[in-house]
Amino acid sequence: MNDLLIRFWRWFEIAPEQYSIEGAPQIYGHEEDDFPYFDQLLMCAQKIVDDNDLTEGAISDLLTVMAIDNESESVSEYIQENSSPKQLEQIVKIGIEHMQFNARWQLSEIIINRKPKGYFFYLDRLCHDDHPYVSSRAKSCMERVRNKTN
C-alpha cells in the first residue's frame, strides 16, 4: 500500500502534507480517481478493513486512501459496512488526529452511523477541529444526533 501511495503523490504532483491542508488543487486538470492505480488503492483499503489485526500504520494508510477517495466515499462506506466494533474504535481513535482533513470529516459520518463506544466524545472533538470543513461537517452530524434524541 505504501508504494501505491508514494506513486499517487508523485502522479498527483503534491506532497501529502500540502494535500492535508488544501485538498486537491483545481489547477492540475485531473481528479484523484484519475490515478491509473486508483482501483488498486481501493482494494488495498478494503483488504486492511478485512484484516482482523489492524496496525497503526495500516490504519493511517487506510485513512489516507479514505481522504483521497473523498468524492465517492466508497472507502468510508466500506468501513461503515464491514469493520468490526473493535476495528471501528481503533480507526476512529487514530482518525480524529489524522493529518488528512478529508479523512477526518468522513469520520463524522461514520461515527453517527455506527456509534462506536465513546462516539459523542469523538464527534465533539471533530466539532472543534482546526479545519473549518471538518468542524462544519461534524457540527452538522452533531445536530442530527441531537435532533434524534429530542
Segments the model singles out, each with a brief description of its role:
Residues 50-62, 83-97, 116-128, 148-150:
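Amphipathic alpha-helical scaffolding segments comprising HEAT/armadillo-like alpha-solenoid repeats
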Residues 97-99, 109, 113:
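Charged linear interaction tracts used for macromolecular binding and regulation
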Residues 59, 72-75, 104, 135:
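Residue-level detector of extended alpha-helical repeat arrays and alpha-solenoid scaffolds
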Residues 1-67:
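Intrinsically disordered, serine/threonine- and proline-rich low-complexity regions
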Residues 67-70, 80-84, 111-115, 142-146:
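Alpha-solenoid repeat junctions
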Residues 99-100, 130-133:
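Short inter-helical turns and helix N-cap capping residues of alpha-solenoid HEAT/ARM repeat scaffolds
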Residues 62-72, 96-100:
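HEAT-repeat alpha-solenoid elements in large eukaryotic scaffold proteins
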Residues 74, 91, 106, 122, ...:
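Alpha-solenoid helical repeat scaffolds
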